[in-house]
């Protein structure tokens, strides 16, 4: 059960929680598609603290809370807040706890969300911590796979791009290890998946690593593409050496299964060409759309009766 619990890692959400969230997300989606909202969390307040830029994640969290009947307080720019005066993360979290019922935090430092949960007396949701994890993105990614393909089990899932710094990849691989799937990892050598992520996966025999996407594209059921995380590189020459390593275009998609899907956590740069957007395999905008009902489900399970 998730009631009154923080979610800072996908490991904080077990398989029963996931299945429950999928079912509840279906209900929340129906509410949205009918043009409605609820008053399930009337008089409850969410505090959003985003120390890094965000569009989809921030908007979907705030939209989710409003659709649940709650309200949102936020720091629009941490550079103009007390953080700019030297206030510690611990003190900021203590103050946010006193003003709200739940805290959503995005921070550039890996482990910041876990630290925040130690100082908060209210539940904390990790909206991304550096190159660590992004658990709510993973929940909506799993929901997208299930809803768009019918099931998660039995699929071959190919992840391509920045596997080293891509926090959505880290969380998703850990979560997928609970399902009966095969995983292909495609990246340049310097952007391979970190060993610490692999150590969290029990059976590695279902995971294969490649540097050539064309070798696995025809057997792929779900192609999960990520941008190269420019902001995580300390050496820009290293970044320049890998930019544009992979590109999904119409020709590549023509080799995919007709019922395969393409996902991307967004924003994209040049790793998926605009010409792919209208193809039936493209589901990344639908994936982003599911962010609101999935986050509604999670917030309600944490704060609701």
UniProtKB/Swiss-Prot annotation:
Pfam family, one: OTCace_N
Catalysis: reaction(s): carbamoyl phosphate + L-aspartate = N-carbamoyl-L-aspartate + phosphate + H(+)
List of residues binding carbamoyl phosphate: 56-57, 106, 134, 137, 266-267
MF GO annotations: amino acid binding; aspartate carbamoyltransferase activity
Superkingdom field: Archaea
Keywords from the named record: Pyrimidine biosynthesis, Transferase
EC number: 2.1.3.2
InterPro entries xref list: Asp/Orn_carbamoyltranf_P-bd (IPR006132), Asp/Orn_carbamoylTrfase (IPR006130), Asp/Orn_carbamoylTrfase_sf (IPR036901), Asp_carbamoyltransf (IPR002082), Asp_carbamoyltransf_Asp/Orn-bd (IPR006131)
Pathway in which this enzyme or protein is active: Pyrimidine metabolism; UMP biosynthesis via de novo pathway; (S)-dihydroorotate from bicarbonate: step 2/3
UniProt KW Transferase keyword: yes
Swiss-Prot/TrEMBL GO biological process terms: 'de novo' pyrimidine nucleobase biosynthetic process; 'de novo' UMP biosynthetic process; amino acid metabolic process
Subunit description: Heterooligomer of catalytic and regulatory chains.
Family: Belongs to the aspartate/ornithine carbamoyltransferase superfamily. ATCase family.
Function statement: Catalyzes the condensation of carbamoyl phosphate and aspartate to form carbamoyl aspartate and inorganic phosphate, the committed step in the de novo pyrimidine nucleotide biosynthesis pathway.
The name this protein goes by in its record: Aspartate carbamoyltransferase catalytic subunit
Species the sequence originates in: Thermoplasma acidophilum (strain ATCC 25905 / DSM 1728 / JCM 9062 / NBRC 15155 / AMRC-C165)
Name of the coding gene: pyrB
């Amino acid at each position: 059960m998730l009631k009154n619990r923080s979610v800072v890692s996908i490991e904080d959400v077990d398989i029963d929680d996931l299945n429950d969230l999928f079912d509840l997300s279906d209900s929340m989606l129906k509410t949205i598609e009918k043009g409605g909202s609820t008053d399930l969390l009337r008089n409850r307040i969410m505090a959003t603290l985003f120390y890094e830029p965000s569009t989809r994640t921030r908007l979907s969290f705030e939209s989710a809370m409003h659709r649940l009947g709650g309200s949102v307080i936020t720091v629009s720019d941490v550079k103009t807040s007390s953080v700019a005066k030297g206030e510690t993360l611990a003190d900021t979290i203590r103050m946010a706890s006193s003003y709200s019922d739940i805290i959503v935090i995005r921070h550039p430092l890996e482990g910041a969300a876990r630290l925040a949960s130690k100082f908060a007396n209210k539940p904390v949701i990790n909206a991304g911590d550096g190159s660590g994890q992004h658990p709510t993105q993973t929940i909506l990614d799993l929901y997208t796979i299930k809803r768009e393909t019918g099931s998660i089990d039995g699929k071959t899932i190919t992840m391509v791009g920045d596997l080293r710094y891509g926090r959505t990849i880290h969380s998703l691989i850990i979560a997928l290890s609970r399902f009966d799937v095969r995983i292909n990892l495609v990246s340049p050598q310097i952007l391979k998946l970190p060993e610490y992520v692999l150590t969290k996966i029990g059976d590695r025999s279902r995971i294969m690593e490649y540097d050539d996407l064309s070798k696995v594209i025809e057997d792929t059921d779900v192609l999960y593409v990520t941008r190269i995380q420019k902001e995580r590189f300390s050496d820009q020459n290293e970044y320049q050496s890998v930019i544009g390593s992979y590109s999904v275009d119409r020709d590549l998609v023509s080799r995919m299964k007709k019922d395969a899907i393409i996902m991307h956590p967004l924003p994209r740069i040049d790793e998926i060409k605009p010409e792919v957007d209208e193809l039936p395999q493209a589901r990344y905008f639908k994936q982003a759309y599911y962010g609101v009902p999935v986050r509604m489900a999670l917030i309600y399970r944490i704060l609701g009766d």
